[in-house]
Structures are given as structure tokens and as C-alpha cells.
From Swiss-Prot:
The keyword Coiled coil does not apply. It comes from the Bacteria. InterPro entries: CbiD (IPR002748), CbiD_sf (IPR036074). One of its GO terms (molecular function) is cobalt-precorrin-5B C1-methyltransferase activity. The keyword S-adenosyl-L-methionine applies. This is Cobalt-precorrin-5B C(1)-methyltransferase. Belongs to the CbiD family. It comes from Paraburkholderia xenovorans (strain LB400). It is an enzyme of class 2 (transferase). Pfam families: CbiD. GO terms for biological process: anaerobic cobalamin biosynthetic process; methylation. It catalyses: Co-precorrin-5B + S-adenosyl-L-methionine = Co-precorrin-6A + S-adenosyl-L-homocysteine.
């Protein structure tokens, strides 16, 4: 028999970033090379000072087969299973691993292993050609390896290769290809901890998408809630993928980022229901944080001539799409009305030099409202 759902759900469990996994595995592999001790657990210190033991699934010596006289042919590798807690992270359950070699020159050199991408476009925090290992994870690894070197009186350096098993396929489910990060995933994290449903990585990718487009000379961007609205903007303006920002429910992340990274023209396009939430002042369009206000839609329709019968029908509608269809049948442009209110909300946030416009679509991606 199926168990009852508890009235009070258990607290959501936090997890650890790929940056934390990379730090633990690189530390364990380096320690094996310097001490001969293979670890089952690697304890790391997160940026805010928390000490975290990370279990390892392997820690072993390997033969790199390298002929460089300035480095050791022998290396070591260690791996851990990425635990994202209760966050719906694409990398949850993947094996993140590090391969480490000792080199003569002090410091740490980073390389992209299997499943980790390489930066191919300007506009990110990393230079073109660099492995997609973000600055905080790089610092975490560098700090831990420097401390280990001091403990062991080791004066050389480390070559660290980070990989993710299956990462090339997983990366296709992320924004990396559009950002110009090719061949795999990014090694991410600023605190070392994944907060369930914080969506910080998604919001960061939205900001990166805007930054990359600007750095590559694009002055007109379209931020879209999903595939249908994105297809509508691609067809309407002929914009390339790099200029199409997949914002999902996070329209606020796009609008607020315009203060730091403005563009000449910003087109916001989304399903009618999503845009009706923005029109009501909501900047997070997810159903758990905002809802469609049919009463408000009826009031707006009334301002443009809807009779009492139509107002009542809109209030009683099963969906926002039904509401807009009822209005259109009586020549009340509810799609345009919602776009005008959404545009007013957006203009109150973005700098005046950003020319914003709104587009609403139906479920098939047809444009059913606009405001400029």
C-alpha cells in the first residue's frame, strides 16, 4: 500500500556543487601522490569556512604516459558522486573526478577532462580556450593544494584535469552550447553548497547568456519563457541562438541584469499566462511563487470595453488561454492589454536607454499580443 504523504514535508536537503567535488577529488589525488596514502574521504573547507567530508568512490595511481621531463609520468585520480541534495540538478548522481600530475613549476594548471567543456566565446569570466572551471572552484582547488604542498614541504606544482562521467551528454541539457562552452559541463559554485530550488545556477546562466551576446556585438536580445516563445522570436526577427536568452520563469533576472549589462533593444516574449503574471508585478513567473489573476484580467478587459457578461466569463475561465480566447471573440485585445501592463512593469526596472517591448504567445507559439 502506498504511504500517505506527510502533512508537514521534511526539510529539503542541501547538496554540494561540482566545484566542491572537484576540490575534494583533486586534493585526494594530490595527497596520494605526495604521501602514498589513498583516501576514502577527503575533507575540504568551503568558502564560508564549513568543513565538509566528501566520500570518494575511487582514489588510485595512474600512468599518464607523458614524456615531458618537467613532470612526473605517474599521476593519480580520485572520484566522487555528485550529490545535489533535493535540488533538481542535471549533474546529480554523476561521477566528478580529478586527475593530478606533479610538475616542476609551482602553482596549479587546470585542464578540461572528459565531460568538462571549453570556453569558445568571449563574454564569460574565463578567457577563450580555457577549461570551463569557474573562478571560485579554481581558487578552492588552488588553496587546498597550496596548503597540502606546504604540509608536505613540496616545492613543485600541480596539473589538475577535471572530468565528469557522461558530462558531454549532460551538457546538452544545459545552456552551455548556447554560451559557447563546448564539449561538456561547467564546474560551478560560489559557496560550495547547492541550495534546493534556489535556481542560482540557472539565473547565473541567464546573466552569462546576456554577457556573451553583448561581448559578441549583439545589441538586440530576446528573452523567452520557453521553446514556443523562442521559436516565435526567431521567426519574427530572425535572431540567431546567441541573441535568444532562455529565461524560463526568471524574467526578473533579465530585467535587473540590464542595469549592469544594458542592450539597445530587449524583446520579452512569453506565454500569455506567464506575461499576465509579469503584468501584475511578479518577477518570478513559476506557479509556486505567482499565480494567474483572472479577476485582474477581467478588470483590465473592462477598461477596454468588455461587457459584464464577458467579464464574468473571464473570471470563470478554466485557463488564461480560455480567457484570452473569450476576449478575442468579442474584439477585446486582452493579449495587447496584458503586454502593455507588463511593459510598464519592465520599464520601471530597466535603464531608460534600453528599448523594451513585449510579446505574448498562445500555446502553439502564435503571437497574440504585443506592446512597444
Amino acid at each position: 500500500m502506498r504511504e500517505e504523504t506527510p502533512e508537514q514535508p521534511a526539510p529539503l536537503r542541501s547538496g554540494y556543487t561540482t566545484g566542491s567535488c572537484a576540490t575534494a577529488t583533486s586534493l585526494a589525488a594530490a595527497r596520494l601522490l605526495l604521501t602514498g596514502v589513498a583516501s576514502d574521504v577527503a575533507e575540504i573547507v568551503l568558502p564560508k569556512g564549513q568543513h565538509v567530508p566528501m566520500p570518494l568512490v575511487f582514489c588510485r595511481l595512474i600512468d599518464n604516459g607523458n614524456d615531458n621531463d618537467n613532470s612526473s609520468d605517474a599521476g593519480a585520480e580520485a572520484g566522487t558522486i555528485k550529490d545535489a541534495g533535493d535540488d533538481p540538478d542535471v549533474t546529480h548522481g554523476a561521477v566528478v573526478f580529478a586527475r593530478v600530475r606533479l610538475v616542476a613549476a609551482p602553482g596549479v594548471t587546470f585542464r578540461a577532462g572528459p565531460g568538462v567543456g571549453t570556453v569558445t566565446r568571449a563574454g564569460l569570466t574565463l578567457a577563450v580556450g580555457e577549461p570551463a572551471i569557474n573562478p571560485v572552484p579554481r581558487k578552492m582547488m588552488t588553496d587546498h593544494l597550496a596548503e597540502l604542498a606546504a604540509e608536505q614541504a613540496y616545492g613543485g606544482g600541480f596539473e589538475v584535469t577535471i572530468g565528469v562521467e557522461g558530462g558531454e551528454a549532460l551538457a546538452l541539457k544545459t545552456m552551455n552550447p548556447r554560451l559557447g562552452i563546448l564539449g561538456g559541463l561547467s564546474i560551478l559554485g560560489t559557496t560550495g553548497i547547492v541550495r534546493p530550488f534556489s535556481c542560482s545556477a540557472y539565473i547565473a546562466s541567464i546573466h552569462q547568456g546576456i554577457d556573451v551576446a553583448r561581448a559578441n556585438g549583439y545589441t538586440h536580445l530576446a528573452a523567452c519563457t520557453g521553446n514556443a516563445s523562442e521559436d516565435a522570436m526567431r521567426a519574427h526577427y530572425g535572431l540567431p541562438d546567441i541573441a535568444l536568452i532562455e529565461m524560463g520563469d526568471f524574467v526578473g533576472a533579465v530585467l535587473k541584469h540590464m542595469k549592469r549589462a544594458p542592450v539597445e533593444r530587449l524583446s520579452i516574449c512569453g506565454g500569455f499566462g506567464k506575461l499576465s503574471k509579469l503584468a501584475a508585478g511578479h518577477l518570478d513567473l513559476h506557479s509556486r511563487n505567482s499565480s494567474i489573476d483572472l479577476e485582474q484580467l477581467a478588470q483590465w478587459a473592462a477598461e477596454y470595453g468588455a461587457d459584464t457578461a464577458l467579464q464574468a466569463a473571464i473570471r470563470a475561465a478554466n485557463t488564461s488561454q480560455q480567457a484570452v480566447a473569450l476576449a478575442r471573440a468579442q474584439q477585446v485585445p486582452l493579449g495587447d492589454i496584458v503586454c502593455r501592463h507588463a511593459l510598464a512593469v519592465a520599464r520601471a526596472i530597466v535603464p531608460p536607454q534600453v528599448n523594451v517591448e513585449m510579446f505574448a504567445t498562445d500555446r502553439q507559439g502564435n503571437l497574440i499580443g504585443a506592446a512597444q
